[in-house]
Amino acid sequence: MTTEAAPNLLVLTRHGESEWNKLNLFTGWKDPALSETGIKEAKLGGERLKSRGYKFDIAFTSALQRAQKTCQIILEEVGEPNLETIKSEKLNERYYGDLQGLNKDDARKKWGAEQVQIWRRSYDIAPPNGESLKDTAERVLPYYKSTIVPHILKGEKVLIAAHGNSLRALIMDLEGLTGDQIVKRELATGVPIVYHLDKDGKYVSKELIDN
């Protein structure tokens, strides 16, 4: 749990699989529900946190139902179904612009596999009318620092249930990674990551809760 060197706790979790993940669609700010698998993933993540004794003082999630439902399921599993939960579009997934709602294979046919891969896995190149990961970070990080960090520094145990790219932005900041490093980081659906932070909210260690 917490130690003298790392008194503060932050848990990040990507939402469970959504119906659109299952269909291989670009989702972005579209709002599909969790799939049956996604509900099970969120429940399992919550069970694993409970088995390790984790509790929270406040939770944050996005304005999208797949993250909100994941957050709710986790809190139910750890025995805190009524915990204060703050929802903000600042934690939304990267906005995929013209790619949203398209099957990834269809997008590759339209623009070419290499171009689609550049949009997906470069730090500062955005798809048409969408956000790059850099743009996403510029939305997520000011909110994290102004709104979430004060709770961490008060010693509150914080849960954030969000999305692959909004969480990549946070992880890049927490771990001091470069843009090139963070675009290679894969985040499994529904698997919590526990960050142990020092008194100033800086990264000390982490634990992947995947078993």
Swiss-Prot record:
SMART domains for this protein: PGAM
Keywords assigned by UniProt, alphabetized: Glycolysis, Isomerase, Phosphoprotein
List of catalytic residues: 15 (tele-phosphohistidine intermediate), 93 (proton donor/acceptor)
Pathway the protein takes part in: Carbohydrate degradation; glycolysis; pyruvate from D-glyceraldehyde 3-phosphate: step 3/5
One Gene Ontology term, aspect cellular component: cytosol
Positions bearing the site annotation: Transition state stabilizer: 163
Alphabetized GO MF terms: phosphoglycerate mutase activity
Gene3D superfamilies associated with the record: Phosphoglycerate mutase-like
The UniProt record lists the keyword NADP: no
The reaction(s) this protein catalyses: (2R)-2-phosphoglycerate = (2R)-3-phosphoglycerate
Pfam families assigned to the protein according to its UniProt record, in alphabetical order: His_Phos_1
Enzyme class: isomerase
Residue numbers carrying Phosphothreonine: 37
Processing and modification events after translation: The N-terminus is blocked.
Isomerase is among the record's keywords: yes
Annotated GO biological process: canonical glycolysis; gluconeogenesis
InterPro entries xrefs: His_Pase_superF_clade-1, His_PPase_superfam, PG/BPGM_mutase_AS, Phosphogly_mut1
Entry's family note: Belongs to the phosphoglycerate mutase family. BPG-dependent PGAM subfamily.
Quaternary structure, from the entry: Monomer.
PANTHER family assigned: PHOSPHOGLYCERATE MUTASE
Name of this chain's protein: Phosphoglycerate mutase
Gene: gpm1
